[in-house]
């Protein structure tokens, strides 16, 4: 049976920003209730933050998701180039929020430098241990901020470009986080899973809410988006999406490395999703769980 196992146990879902949340079966009865819990902070900020600050995250995720960093960079670098085209910077302050091992920060910085941009790097994370990992891979970081991205000490428009890679789905207050990003940053690059789709919602109905509960408990996703709702939230926060792409993650799933861990049913489903994504990426994201990568300009 691929129901219940599909996607959730796939290696790509060992995100750099995974976090553990505790919620009862009754509370996770259905998707709409989970959304309500998230919006009302039913999953407490303190509970969420403790997973990072206690060091539990690193103990459970020792690789910090470095295995899929190269794939992520193929989707993120085009957004970095869009930032350069739109802003023509001579120098740039670069913030990585929830950046795991810091490899994406390192490569984005290198890309900017190759384009003639002088870069000043910052890292922000709830975990001091995670920040130390960032420092190991980015010894030239100017400052490491042990803070919550929804409430920072950064000055107004103090950052030119912020990286939010697999982070927004974890925050307890999406609107507050986007508002804070508007305050502190001129541009933001997001990578976000689109988990409010036909496939996930159908499985959740069949499993009586257990799929959404598993998403919370296994990978810490307390927010589920589709692109339309996400775009509306970004626009409401004062952001303008300059460029976006659906990632067609199914192409990655079908790579030789990932296929070693698949059963036949998974390969078949990914092939179907990959075909649909090739024809209509937007439609595919409504049917199956893909990611969107976008760059947002804030004024």
Predicted features, each with a name:
Residues 13, 49-69, 172-298:
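S-adenosyl-L-methionine-dependent methyltransferase catalytic module, highlighting the catalytic core
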Residues 129, 152, 170, 195-197:
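Active-site loop signature of alpha/beta-hydrolase-fold enzymes
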Residues 156-159, 173:
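Active-site acidic short loop of glycosyltransferases
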């Amino acid at each position: 049976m691929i129901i219940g196992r599909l996607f959730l146990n796939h290696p790509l879902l060992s995100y750099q920003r995974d976090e553990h949340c505790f919620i009862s079966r009754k509370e996770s009865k259905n998707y709409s209730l989970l959304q309500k819990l998230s919006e009302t902070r039913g999953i407490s900020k303190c509970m969420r933050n403790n997973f990072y600050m206690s060091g539990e995250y690193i103990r459970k995720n020792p690789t910090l998701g470095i295995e899929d960093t190269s794939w992520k960079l193929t989707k993120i670098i085009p957004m970095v180039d869009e930032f350069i085209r739109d802003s023509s910077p001579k120098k740039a302050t670069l913030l990585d929020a929830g950046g795991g091992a810091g490899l994406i920060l390192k490569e984005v910085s290198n890309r900017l430098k190759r384009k003639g941009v002088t870069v000043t790097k910052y890292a922000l994370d709830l975990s001091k241990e995670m920040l130390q990992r960032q420092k190991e891979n980015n010894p030239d970081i100017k400052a490491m901020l042990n803070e919550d991205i929804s409430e920072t000490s950064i000055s107004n428009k103090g950052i030119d470009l912020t990286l939010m890679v697999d982070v927004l789905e974890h925050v307890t207050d999406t609107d507050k986080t986007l508002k804070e990003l508007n305050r502190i940053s001129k541009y933001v690059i997001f990578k976000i899973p689109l988990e409010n789709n036909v496939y996930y919602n159908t499985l959740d109905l069949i499993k009586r809410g257990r799929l959404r509960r598993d998403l919370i408990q296994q990978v810490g996703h307390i927010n589920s988006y589709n692109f339309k709702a996400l775009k509306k939230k970004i626009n409401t926060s004062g952001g303008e999406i300059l460029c976006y792409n659906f990632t067609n993650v199914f192409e990655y799933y079908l790579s030789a490395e990932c296929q070693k861990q698949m059963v036949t049913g998974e390969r078949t489903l990914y092939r179907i999703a990959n075909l649909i994504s090739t024809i209509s990426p937007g439609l595919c994201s409504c049917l199956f769980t893909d990611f969107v990568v976008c760059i947002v300009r804030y004024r």
